[in-house]
């Protein structure tokens, strides 16, 4: 099994269509395809940061998106994710951004989404059918408990 740490350059070129997840020590939280994860970050940047990547949520948008969240920054990351979750509730599902670098791109499923999805805070569902933000919080809590860095890795 080859593991590749994401960085913006590598991520966009090589890992976009691979399965990715959050890893803390030997705990792995599967997310889904890399383009799905990029969509979450794109949606946050476009809708909550006025398209200025990392301007409001630098720990998640800059540090973690590069591939690793230092254990010393986990509290800040948790607070940023709480704000993101709250603020995304104000946006309808049609405000999802699949790729901030190409706003014409749409999710593979188009507008065919579950009626349970009522806003952008519950739009993102992992490949295992779990709420993405819940899984994200679980990974951050594990990082805090174990005092080990969280990484984004492909399998």
Language-model regions, residue ranges each:
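Acidic (Asp/Glu-rich) sequence patches and key acidic residues
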Residues: 2-138, 142-155
